[in-house]
């Protein structure tokens, strides 16, 4: 899916998490681990590979020399945006294959699921 942008799926996961964070498109590795559901060792390796490709930059957090921040580079922003656009276009093509009735039925089903999730989250048991 992301090959046209020269990205693997895991690269898209990290870049899109940073892009979603808003300006300055910067998160801690811990935040990225929570966003992408990988181990700290996996994230360290991924960040190194992305840094070698100049898609992200790591720097020490101001005021805390132990903390690291990861920021999208200009090239990282460009690639993330291109990949997100490609994903949205692919999703639109899939949705365009549905009839109006199928789209309505899918929307109704998804609303039902969301209500179930909301009830599940509200249940303290």
Language-model-detected regions and their locations in the chain:
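Charged, amphipathic alpha-helical coiled-coil/dimerization segments
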Residues: 26, 48-108
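C-terminal regulatory/oligomerization modules of transcriptional regulators
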Residues: 101-125
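Short amphipathic alpha-helical interaction/hinge segments
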Residues: 22, 26, 84, 118-121
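N-terminal helix-turn-helix DNA-binding core of bacterial DNA-binding proteins
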Residues: 1-39, 125
């Amino acid at each position: 899916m992301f090959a046209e942008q020269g990205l693997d799926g895991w690269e898209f996961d990290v870049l899109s998490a940073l892009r979603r964070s808003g300006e300055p498109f910067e998160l801690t590795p811990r935040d990225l681990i929570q966003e992408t559901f990988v181990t700290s060792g996996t994230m360290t390796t991924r960040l190194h590979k992305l840094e070698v490709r100049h898609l992200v930059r790591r720097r020490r957090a101001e005021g805390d020399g132990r903390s690291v921040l990861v920021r999208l580079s200009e090239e990282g922003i460009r690639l993330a945006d291109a990949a997100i656009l490609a994903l949205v276009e692919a999703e639109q093509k899939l949705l365009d294959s549905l009839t109006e009735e199928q789209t309505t039925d899918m929307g109704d089903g998804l609303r039902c699921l969301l209500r179930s999730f909301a009830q599940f989250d509200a249940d303290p048991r």
